[in-house]
Design a protein with these regions (language model features):
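N-terminal Lys/Arg-rich, disordered targeting/topogenic segments
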Residues: 1-14
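Hydrophobic membrane-insertion alpha-helices, especially the h-region
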Residues: 17-40
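Periplasmic-binding protein-like
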Residues: 26, 205-210
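Early extracytoplasmic/lumenal segment of secretory-pathway proteins
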Residues: 45-117
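Extracytoplasmic "Venus flytrap"/periplasmic binding protein-like
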Residues: 96-157
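Non-catalytic, usually N-terminal nucleic-acid engagement modules in DNA/RNA processing proteins
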Residues: 167-177
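A bilobed periplasmic-binding-protein/Venus flytrap-type ligand-binding module shared by bacterial periplasmic
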Residues: 179-194, 208
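Short amphipathic alpha-helical coupling segments at ligand-binding clamshell hinges
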Residues: 193-204
Length: 210
């Protein structure tokens, strides 16, 4: 018969002294497993039921809260059929920024992009952004007296210039939400899953942020 040593306070203390890391590891694995389960099983709105606004730059948490509240209000008033209208600030890396934007656009991530002029031109020249002239000609988009010069992009394949963005210098109302509009251009991602509603959001910004 195997001998069983009595469990004493000293033995428990010794056990935890040498095996504490096992319990820490167990807790970490449990947290990781829970997060993984939540991430893989949580409901995600389909592309047709959400509008995603990607903006270059870092937005403070307080400004992010204001933007989230604004977009939720717009979702209820302008996009009643949408499940999500979201804002994501994008920290642009000078070395890999263009590559990162290209990966996102190729994957159809985001719908409305607001970027500094040079990154916007680089992204749009490869055809990632939708041409806006047809929307303006049909009356679906009105830009008023905004100077659209900086929104024209030379297509890398055809060599022709197309209007692919709306300069945001005059949309100074964005500053109240922590966004610096100077020197930026906003455009519609051509591969976005919700062009009509993204266009509606762009029009709202033009009408209400000047």
């Amino acid at each position: 018969m195997p001998m069983r040593l009595p469990i004493t306070r000293e033995r428990i203390r010794t056990h935890f002294h040498y095996a504490w890391w096992q319990y820490v590891l167990l807790v970490c694995l449990a947290i990781f497993g829970w997060n993984l389960l939540y991430t893989t099983t949580r409901y995600r709105s389909p592309e047709s039921l959400k509008v995603e606004w990607y903006c270059q730059g870092v937005v403070a948490p307080q400004a992010q809260d204001k933007l989230d509240a604004l977009l939720e209000q717009l979702r209820l008033e302008l996009f009643p059929d949408m499940e999500e209208v979201t804002f994501t600030s994008v920290a642009y890396d000078q070395t890999y920024g263009d590559m990162q934007l290209m990966v996102w656009s190729s994957a159809g991530q985001g719908d409305l992009y607001l970027l500094q002029r040079e990154p916007f031109q680089n992204l749009a020249s490869g055809g990632a952004m939708a041409q806006l002239t047809p929307y303006i000609e049909s009356g679906a988009l009105t830009t008023g007296d905004i100077d659209l010069t900086a929104g024209y992009v030379t297509d890398s394949e055809t060599g022709k210039k197309y209007l692919m963005g709306v300069p945001t210098d005059s949309l100074t109302g964005l500053e109240a939400y922590g966004i610096n509009p100077e020197g930026c251009v906003m455009g519609l991602l051509a591969s976005g899953g919700n062009l009509d509603n993204t266009l509606k959001l762009m029009q709202w910004l033009i009408d209400n942020m000047r």
